[in-house]
Curated annotation (Swiss-Prot):
Disruption phenotype: Leads to inviable cells.
EC number: 2.7.11.1
Biased composition (Basic residues): 8-17
Organism: Candida albicans (strain SC5314 / ATCC MYA-2876) (Yeast)
Listed name of the protein: Cell cycle protein kinase DBF2
Catalysed transformations (reactions): L-seryl-[protein] + ATP = O-phospho-L-seryl-[protein] + ADP + H(+); L-threonyl-[protein] + ATP = O-phospho-L-threonyl-[protein] + ADP + H(+)
Role according to the record: Ser/Thr-protein kinase involved in the mitotic exit network (MEN) and required after the metaphase to anaphase cell cycle transition. Required for proper nuclear segregation, mitotic spindle organization, actomyosin ring contraction, primary septum assembly, and normal hyphal morphogenesis.
Length: 710
């Protein structure tokens, strides 16, 4: 493989530094600029005449030295990077002596060449020539704001920018993936061809019948051709059949979908491209896409397809049918210690898989952990449809935290009992009651409000250093997991208050607010090893557990002998599913009562759409193609530039598989239908509506089996 990406021999002979070599190659590859005959008629080409005569050798030597100096200057000035806004075209103009002023632009040189200075008002022929010249210049010139050449410092700053590095990585991965996939396809095709030829020559059914051999060979070639065409197709929105909505966010929706040709079930996220760009959320979408395409872990939700059109971006992800961990907690109230240990251990393993990819979540919540069909945990939502971890949200929460400094004054007012702040109670039943009341009040506020609430959210699980704007590392996710373990065992987060302001104040004074829960008779709810783990997770950055190995060594996890075998253990809860389209563990978006808790989300979405519509009215955009720098482009293409390298198709896509006309595999297996155990698809006789598929419309509420244990 490496031989396909080596430099050519002509480049290997140079011994420049890497960046100098690239710049030199680019400068040598610049094309000459061609000008029409009408323009060339008026350009002074006297400098191309025969060599001048010199009166004496000294004058000739002096002229040659000046010429050599000018040539050196010319060579230095015209080494321009390929992605510079302008390409040097001075080598088509006369070389003049070096002046103290900046070099004259080619446009001015050509215009000056058209006027001889004697006729200030040119005639009709001259005007026609000038118009022809101007048309050529318009094609040669860059935009007005980019008429300069990048300096060396600007060029290398641009080359080392995060955007350039990402595009470079995308290009490298694209070509490596393309050639590896192509070689894999060619090798498999040769193997299939050899098997077909062998069967046609040895099978008694075809051995002595030339007509049947030709017929079967023609069918085989047709299936290979169909497979090759399928491989070239890019996914589109119309390729997916929408079954039901399972999620809603400020930037788009999530639908349970089925891909029409491969019959794959997926969760399809549909996001408004213009809104993402307007609210500066493009980076979060690309981060989500990069994480999902790089992961091979069973702990992270997998990406199946990523594609876009002029208005939307689409992420077709693995459908995890068991609902989220928040739903599990709502159904049970709290978990018994063995069950809590099972789930928190899997959460640590999932978060560690994310950290190994070089990413930090920053805003882990029970809603981010899904339960798959076998009852195990998968991590999702890395900052996408629900606007998770957007910088605006963190900044607004930071301001909210700073504004609560005024609450300190209440402690000095002994005559004002209403404003006097008290440390949260350690009694578990009191805190559970307060937490339930605060949730009910929040739902009531959402149902009464007709406009979107502030972007500020509750910081129940977010580490303090994130809100304070301080430097942080991936251990902030350990803080969040500590808060979730606390809630799983007690039924409320450690810093929850009766009002949101109290929650912020508890977080700001977390060392005082974090108290070990007790029952009425004074017994501690947590065991010693459980409490020791929590205070090592919810701790200052220097005292917090620093890596996954330290987490595994805690006495709380002493019963776990093999962390690599977690997914083979029997979970305490397994979703009861009717079929692969069963979305019963997700909210029913056709139920008006259930949608009351999404009222804030819908209002925020409406507010975003109004903001986008307002910006569209102030900006004149056309749907027709226009001309820019001599090139035709569509106005919508500027949005695609923000999502370069977004398209993705997973390797196990059934369109990359091969089957014969009867449903058998390309290796003449024993399949007998359109879908076989290997997930391979019959490309010729595909049935649009598969058999044995349920309607998937059962959205009745489910009784969590764990609820009977508490």
């Amino acid at each position: 493989m490496t031989n396909f990406f080596n430099r050519s021999p002509k480049h290997q002979s140079h011994h420049y530094q890497p960046h100098q070599q690239d710049v030199t190659d680019i400068s040598y590859s610049m094309e000459n600029v061609s000008i029409s005959s009408n323009a060339m008629m008026d350009i002074d080409t006297s400098y191309r005449s025969s060599k001048p005569t010199y009166n004496n050798p000294q004058q000739q030597q002096q002229q040659q030295q000046q010429q050599q100096a000018q040539n050196n200057l010319f060579n230095k000035e015209n080494i321009t990077p390929l992605n510079s806004p302008t390409k040097s075209i001075l080598h088509n103009s006369p070389q003049q002596a070096k002046s103290s002023t900046s070099p004259q632009h080619l446009y001015n040189k050509l215009v000056n060449a058209n006027y001889n200075g004697n006729s200030p008002q040119p005639g009709i022929q001259q005007q026609q020539n000038n118009r022809a010249l101007q048309n050529n210049i318009n094609q040669l010139q860059p935009p007005l704001n980019k008429r300069y050449k990048l300096t060396e410092a600007e060029f290398y700053a641009k080359a080392n920018s995060a955007r350039t590095k990402r595009l470079t990585s995308i290009a490298q991965l694209y070509f490596l993936d393309y050639y590896c996939d192509m070689f894999d396809y060619v090798i498999n095709r040769r193997e299939r061809t050899a098997i077909v030829e062998k069967n046609l020559l040895t099978d008694p059914m075809y051995k002595n019948d030339i007509t049947k051999q030709q017929f079967e060979w023609k069918n085989y070639i047709g299936r290979e051709r169909a497979l090759l065409r399928k491989r070239r197709l890019k996914p589109k929105h119309k390729d997916f059949e929408m079954i039901t909505q399972i999620g809603q966010g400020g930037y788009g929706q999530v639908f349970l979908s089925r891909k029409r040709d491969t019959r794959e079930i997926c969760a399809l996220k549909i996001l408004n491209k213009k809104l993402l760009i307007k609210l500066d959320e493009t980076r979060h979408v690309l981060t989500e896409r990069d994480i999902l395409t790089n992961t091979r872990s069973d702990w992270l939700v997998k990406l199946l397809y990523a594609f876009q059109d002029q208005e939307k971006v689409f992420l077709a992800m693995e459908f995890v049918p068991g609902g989220d961990f928040r739903t599990l907690l709502n159904n049970t109230g709290y978990l018994i210690p063995p069950h809590a240990r099972f789930y928190i251990s899997e959460m640590f393993a999932a978060v560690n898989s994310l950290h190994e990819l070089g990413f930090t979540h920053r805003d882990l919540k029970p809603e981010n952990f899904l339960i798959d069909s076998k009852g195990h945990i998968k991590l999702t939502d890395f900052g996408l449809a629900a606007g998770t971890v957007c910088n605006d949200r963190i900044e607004s929460m930071k301001i909210k935290l700073q504004n609560l400094q005024n609450l300190n004054d209440f402690n000095d007012d002994s005559n004002n009992d209403n404003h006097h702040y008290q440390v949260p109670s350690s009694l578990i039943y009191e805190r559970q009651k307060i937490f339930k009341q605060s949730q009910q009040q929040q739902q009531q506020q959402n149902s009464n409000n007709t406009t979107a609430n502030s972007i500020v959210g509750s910081p129940d699980y977010m580490a303090l250093e994130v809100l304070e704007g301080k430097n942080y590392n991936y251990t902030i996710d350990y803080w969040s997991l500590g808060c979730m373990l606390f809630e799983a065992l007690c039924g409320y987060p450690p810093f929850s208050g009766s009002k949101q302001d109290e929650t912020y104040y508890n977080l700001k004074h977390w060392k005082t607010a974090l108290r070990r829960p007790q029952t009425k008779d004074g017994r501690y709810v947590f065991s010693d090893r459980t409490w020791n783990l929590i205070i090592k997770l919810i701790a200052s950055p220097n005292n917090r557990l620093q890596n996954f190995k330290q987490v595994q060594q805690q006495s709380y996890f002493s019963d776990i002998k093999d962390w690599g075998n977690l997914r083979q253990k029997t979970p305490p809860f397994t979703p009861q599913l009717d079929n692969e389209e069963d979305a019963g563990y997700f909210d029913d978006f056709e139920d008006d009562e259930m949608m009351m808790k999404y009222k804030d989300v819908f209002a925020r979405q409406e507010q975003n759409e109004q903001l986008l519509e307002k910006s569209n009215t102030t900006t004149t955009t056309t749907t027709t193609t226009t001309t820019k720098n001599g090139k035709r482009f569509s106005p919508g293409s500027k949005f695609n530039d923000n999502f370069i390298g977004f398209t993705f198709k997973h390797k196990s896509n059934p369109n990359n598989k091969f089957t014969n006309g009867s449903g058998n595999t390309g290796r003449y297996g024993n399949g007998n239908g359109n879908n076989n155990n290997n997930g391979e698809i019959n490309l010729l006789n595909m049935v649009e509506n598969g058999n044995g598929i349920g309607n998937g419309n059962s959205r009745s509420s489910r009784l969590n089996p764990l609820a009977t244990l508490y």
